[in-house]
Amino acid sequence: ISDANVATVTGSTTTIVGAGTTSVTVSQAADDNYNSATATMTLTVSQADITTATVASISDQTYTGSAITISPTVTFNGSTVTETTDYTVSFANNTNAGTASLTITGTGNFTGTKTVSFTIVKAAPTISFNDVSKTYGEVDFNLSATSSSTGVFSYTISDANVATVTGSTTTIVGAGTTSVTVTQAADTNYNSATATMTLTVSQADITTATVASISGQTYTGSAITISPTVTFNG
């Protein structure tokens, strides 16, 4: 066989090595009545259909925000074949959570295409929700969490004696410490998740309160006590 990249021969047993065309020469020794002689034929080995190859199952992939690429394990007749040499790989719908596809296209000894699917699962979002310190008497404020997800936030406060929340608007009720939990709904690419921070409300300084003017008192011979009118923030 003239091209060992196409086939090899041992005795008369021929082993196919790769797709292509080669000449095969047979030489026959002389006998009592005939001279020695040769003859040549052409051996053509066609490319194999890549659809008959096996692509190993692809495990679920987690959403990253970027296109996900995988080097698949491909076998043909029980032997592993090599990317670039035997096939190329392309992808579709391989960024967002859902069903993505991988297509192998035969090269070299293979022809045709084969497509398999794999799943991109939602990721856990990264939520930033920092502790907050306030002083009793401060005006309402908005809770503000940030996240890699676009899911809607909802907030709960564990101790209504410290603060209450409507939507994200938080009203201070009294001095103390409470935990605040944010829950974020799932979106297209992220699962739902929660995060917790601590809200600390310090006591207000009574010197900022207003004591109403006290009218003159008349001597009684006894200690005079008064219940003052004290206002804070109006």
Which residue ranges define each predicted feature?
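Solvent-exposed beta-strand/loop surfaces, strongest in extracytoplasmic domains of secreted
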Residues: 1-234
